[in-house]
Design a protein with these regions (language model features):
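Juxtamembrane intracellular "pre-TM" segments in multi-pass secondary transporters
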Residues: 1-9, 185-219
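Helix-loop junctions on the cytosolic side of multi-pass membrane transporters
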Residues: 119, 123-124, 166-195, 388-396
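C-terminal transmembrane helical hairpin of 12-TM major facilitator-type secondary transporters
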Residues: 280-320
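C-terminal ends and interior cores of transmembrane alpha-helices
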Residues: 79-94, 287-301
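Transmembrane alpha-helix termini and helix-breaking/packing motifs in multi-pass membrane transporters
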Residues: 27-37, 89-90, 143, 147-169, ...
Length: 396
C-alpha cells in the first residue's frame, strides 16, 4: 500500500508547490508594478494575460493531457510556468507589455498543467473509494496552497526585493517539477486527434449549456470566480488606501487571505445549509455576497474590514459548492468529468478576464477603487438576477 501511495504523495506535493507559486507570483508582479510607478489598477490588466490562455487553449489541453503520459504533462506545465518567471529576470520590467508576456507564459503553463493533475488520479488509484479520497486530498492541498500562497507567499513577496521573490518562485516551481519524477509514466492515448477533440469540446459545451441545471451551475460558478478574481486585485489596492496600511507590509496579504478562510468555512458548511435537491437556493448566499461587496469598501476600520472579507468569502463558499457538486455530478453523466472541468475552466476564465477588464476600465476613467469594487458588485448582481429568472426552468 505504501508503495502505491508514494506516487500520490508526490502528486499532492507537486500540486501544493505549484499552486503556492501560482498565488505568490501575483504579488511579485504587483510589487514590480508598484516599483515602476504603475497605478494599482494595472494589476487587473496584467491579470487578464493569465486568464487568456485558459480561454484560447481550453479545447486542446484536455486532449493533450490524454494523448501523452500525464506525469510528463505535469513536467511540461511546470517548465512553462518556470519559463514565465525566468523571463522576469531578462525583460524590461518597466514595460507593462513585457510583464503581461511573463504572466501570460505562467498562465499557459497553468492551463497545460490543470487537466493532468485530475486526469492522473484514476491511474494512481485502484478503485472508486481511493479515487474519491485522492480527489478530496488534492482539493485540500490546493486550498491550503492558495491560503499559504496568498498569506505566506504574498508576505515573502512584499518583504523582499522582486529579484529575490522571483527567485523563490522559480525555486518552488522547480521543486514541484522535481517531485513529478516520483510519479510513474503511464502511456497516453496516441490515437487522439486534436481537431476532432476541439470540435467535440464545442459540442459538449452546447450540450451542457442546453440543460437548465448545468447551465445554471456554469453561469453561477463563473460569476463567483469573476467576482473573486476582481476582488483579489481590487482589495490588494484598496487595503493601503482605505486602512492606511503600508502596501509592503506583511498584513496586506494576511488580510487578503481572510477571504479564502471564509470560502473554506462556507464550503465546509454548504452541504448542511443547502440540500442538493434544492441547489438553486444557494442564490440567497450569492445575494449576501453582493451586499457585502457593495458595503465593505466604505469602512476604514481594519477589524470591520477583516470581518466583512471573511463574511464575503463564507457567502461565496456556500454559494458555489452546491452548484459545483451538481455540475460535476450531471456533467460526468453527460460528457465526462474531465470535459466538464475543461468547459467550466473556459467559462470561469472568460468571465474573470471580462470582469478584470471592466474593473480596469472603471478605474482608468477615474473612478475610485471603492467605486470600482461596487461596480463589480453590481456586475455580480446582474448575473444573480439573470439566474433568479433562469431558475424557473429547473424543476427540482
Amino acid at each position: 500500500v505504501n508503495i502505491r501511495l508514494k506516487p500520490l504523495q508526490a502528486l499532492y506535493f507537486t500540486q501544493f508547490l505549484s499552486a503556492f507559486a501560482d498565488n505568490m507570483i501575483l504579488f511579485v508582479i504587483a510589487n514590480l508594478l508598484r516599483e515602476n510607478g504603475f497605478s494599482p489598477a494595472m494589476l487587473a490588466l496584467v491579470s487578464i494575460s493569465f486568464f487568456l490562455p485558459y480561454v484560447f487553449l481550453a479545447p486542446l489541453v484536455g486532449p493533450f493531457a490524454d494523448k501523452h503520459a500525464k506525469s510528463i504533462v505535469l513536467v511540461i506545465g511546470n517548465l512553462i510556468k518556470a519559463l514565465g518567471v525566468v523571463l522576469l529576470f531578462f525583460i524590461d520590467q518597466s514595460s507593462i507589455m513585457m510583464l503581461m508576456l511573463c504572466y501570460f507564459t505562467v498562465g499557459v503553463g497553468a492551463v497545460v498543467y490543470s487537466p493532468a493533475k485530475y486526469g492522473i488520479l484514476p491511474e494512481l488509484t485502484r478503485n472508486e473509494d481511493e479515487l474519491f479520497h485522492a480527489n478530496a486530498r488534492i482539493e485540500a492541498y490546493t486550498i491550503f496552497a492558495i491560503l499559504t500562497g496568498i498569506g505566506g507567499g504574498g508576505a515573502i513577496a512584499n518583504m523582499t526585493a522582486p529579484l529575490i521573490s522571483s527567485g523563490i518562485c522559480l525555486l518552488i516551481y522547480l521543486l514541484s517539477l522535481g517531485m513529478t519524477f516520483f510519479i510513474p509514466r503511464m502511456k497516453g492515448n496516441a490515437s487522439i486527434r486534436y481537431g476532432a477533440e476541439a470540435r467535440r469540446f464545442f459540442i459538449d459545451f452546447q450540450h451542457l449549456m442546453n440543460r437548465p441545471e448545468t447551465s445554471f451551475a456554469l453561469i453561477g460558478t463563473g460569476a463567483f470566480w469573476m467576482s473573486s478574481a476582481v476582488l483579489r486585485v481590487a482589495v490588494l489596492a484598496w487595503i493601503p488606501l482605505a486602512l492606511g496600511i503600508n502596501p509592503e507590509s506583511f498584513s496586506v496579504s494576511l488580510i487578503l487571505a481572510t477571504t479564502s478562510i471564509g470560502i473554506i468555512a462556507g464550503a465546509f458548511l454548504a452541504p448542511k445549509l443547502i440540500p442538493l435537491s434544492h441547489f438553486t437556493r444557494s442564490l440567497t448566499y450569492g445575494f449576501g455576497m453582493f451586499l457585502i461587496i457593495v458595503l465593505f469598501p466604505w469602512t476604514n476600520i481594519t477589524f470591520v474590514a477583516i470581518c466583512l472579507l471573511l463574511l464575503v468569502g463564507f457567502m461565496g463558499g456556500v454559494f458555489i459548492i452546491p452548484m459545483n457538486t451538481v455540475l460535476q455530478d450531471e456533467g460526468k453523466r453527460m460528457v465526462g468529468s474531465g470535459k466538464t472541468i475543461a468547459i467550466q475552466n473556459f467559462i470561469e476564465n472568460l468571465l474573470m478576464a471580462v470582469g478584470s477588464g471592466i474593473y480596469y476600465l472603471i478605474t482608468y476613467i477615474g473612478i475610485s477603487i471603492s467605486g470600482a469594487i461596487v461596480g463589480q458588485g453590481l456586475l455580480l448582481l446582474g448575473f444573480l438576477l439573470y439566474l433568479v429568472k433562469y431558475r424557473r426552468r429547473i424543476v427540482r
